[in-house]
Amino acid sequence: MVAVAILAAGRGTRMKSDLPKVLHQLGSCTLVKRVIKSCVSIQPSKIMVIVGYRGGLVQKSLLDNNNNIDNDNTPTLEFVEQTEQLGTGHAIQQLLPYLKDFSEELLVLNGDVPLLRPETIKQLIDTHQQNKNSATILTANLPNPKGYGRIFCNTNNFVTQIVEERDCTAAQTKNHRVNAGVYCFNWPALANILPKLKADNDQQEYYLTDVVPLLDPVMAVDVNDYQEIFGINNRKHLAKAHEILQVRVKDDWMEAGVTLIDPDSITIDDTVLLQQDVIVEPQTHIRGSSIIGSGSRIGPGSLIENSHIGKNTSVLYSVISDSMVADNTRIGPYAHLRGDSQVGSHCRIGNFVELKKATVGDRSNAAHLSYLGDATLGEKVNIGAGTITANYDGVKKHKTKIGDRSKTGSNSVLVAPVTLGEDVTVAAGSVVTKNVEDDSLVIGRARQAVKKGWRLKQSDESKKEENKSSP
């Protein structure tokens, strides 16, 4: 079995933020949560998160969101405090009391390196176990290794030397193989060495790399894609990581049969599920746990968040969050669905229509300029332009129910709580405050009055007033 330690104690001063660096978002997840998700597939015996700066906040964030990681394979997270941030070696020293009787492998990951693939982690562990190494280091060949220490190996990939860049000779700087900061250790071997670490450097810190010369054998494993080891130190790095992740996600979906009209203007979280023959138009963003059914067309200019869109449905210039839309339905342009709204099949939710906690039955339409809040609509209901469900009385929300095949005229107001039966017609401009039985016509407006010749009379009165005021 493998235990995992995640280094997450640093503040990240270059982020210019009060928020710990590992809690900054990359897509749908924080940096540290991404790291945790990357190692779940190896089924670790325990995951220990080493916290420091605002450690309570890091702990709360991860515990609040643990249900979104993988309950089946993720052990309960453990938190180890590093009260002083004295280097990576010092951080791992804090594990000594927690792993007294542990005799297997320890995988060390960085909480600010969020792009590692699970396959890479598995390759590192497999190599370590197959060769019975004391330590195995993940390495990468960078096109521009400036700022990185270099790793030197023999022909069998056993590490012979780690040289910091400032100590490299001109010949050594030509080696582009660098330390990714990801390790697999034999824990008993490492535990014997950790107390011997010294802070003999300018920073007065304990470096984990200093254990390498004291262990044998130590092997290096190259990552296939060097971008996986990209670390986050500032906001520019965060933006770059987002770019890398988006390219990865969108390439995967295009290979799986999804059409992206303008990939550079589209963002898709890696938690999203798209079925074959989905078309995503420009300036569209699909986030969270959203699912898009086959044959649907999303966008342009739309945001879908934590929502399920059925098959052969179109969404145009609209925002849908925490809602569900069934098959063969048209949404938009400029519609807003939120708050666990549910729209049936063969429906139309059109221009400037807002749904909040609304359920719309199959083959129902709300085509123009309506607000339907806390409302339940049956099948084949037609909502006239400008219809409003007045659901809030200043204290609490109330529900509106509209039966099958009912329809409202333009500019109607349904004052909740109110129920309209089946096959009800609401006359245009009505204000409905009481329940209406099936098969009824309801008219709730003032009777039209026509005063013939009114303008002429008004004109005569105006002339008389003008004459009075004349000198």
Curated annotation (Swiss-Prot):
What positions does UniProt annotate as the active site of this protein?
H368 (proton acceptor)
Q: Provide the cofactor note recorded for this chain's UniProt entry.
A: Binds 1 Mg(2+) ion per subunit.
Region described as Pyrophosphorylase: spans on this chain: 1-235
Residues annotated as region N-acetyltransferase? 257-471
Q: What is its main location?
A: cytoplasm
- The residues listed in the UniProt record as binding Mg(2+), with positions renumbered to this chain, are D112, N233
Region of interest (Linker), residue spans:
236-256
Return one Gene Ontology term, BP aspect.
cell morphogenesis
Please give the InterPro entries that the UniProt record associates with this protein. Answer: Bifunctional_GlmU, GlmU-like, GlmU_C_LbH, Hexapep, NTP_transferase_dom, Nucleotide-diphossugar_trans, Trimer_LpxA-like_sf
Pathway per its UniProt entry is: Nucleotide-sugar biosynthesis; UDP-N-acetyl-alpha-D-glucosamine biosynthesis; N-acetyl-alpha-D-glucosamine 1-phosphate from alpha-D-glucosamine 6-phosphate (route II): step 2/2; Nucleotide-sugar biosynthesis; UDP-N-acetyl-alpha-D-glucosamine biosynthesis; UDP-N-acetyl-alpha-D-glucosamine from N-acetyl-alpha-D-glucosamine 1-phosphate: step 1/1; Bacterial outer membrane biogenesis; LPS lipid A biosynthesis
UniProt key word Repeat: yes
EC?
2.7.7.23, 2.3.1.157
Q: Which GO terms describe its cellular component?
A: carboxysome; cytoplasm; membrane
Which cellular compartments is it found in? Answer: Cytoplasm
- This protein's UniProt keywords: Acyltransferase, Cell shape, Cell wall biogenesis/degradation, Cytoplasm, Magnesium, Metal-binding, Multifunctional enzyme, Nucleotidyltransferase, Peptidoglycan synthesis, Repeat, Transferase
For this protein, the record's NCBIfam families field holds:
glmU, PRK14360.1
PANTHER family to which the protein is assigned, alphabetical: BIFUNCTIONAL PROTEIN GLMU (PTHR43584:SF3), NUCLEOTIDYL TRANSFERASE (PTHR43584)
- What does this protein's UniProt record list under function? Catalyzes the last two sequential reactions in the de novo biosynthetic pathway for UDP-N-acetylglucosamine (UDP-GlcNAc). The C-terminal domain catalyzes the transfer of acetyl group from acetyl coenzyme A to glucosamine-1-phosphate (GlcN-1-P) to produce N-acetylglucosamine-1-phosphate (GlcNAc-1-P), which is converted into UDP-GlcNAc by the transfer of uridine 5-monophosphate (from uridine 5-triphosphate), a reaction catalyzed by the N-terminal domain.
Q: Per its record, how is this protein called by name?
A: Bifunctional protein GlmU
Q: Which organism is it from?
A: Trichodesmium erythraeum (strain IMS101)
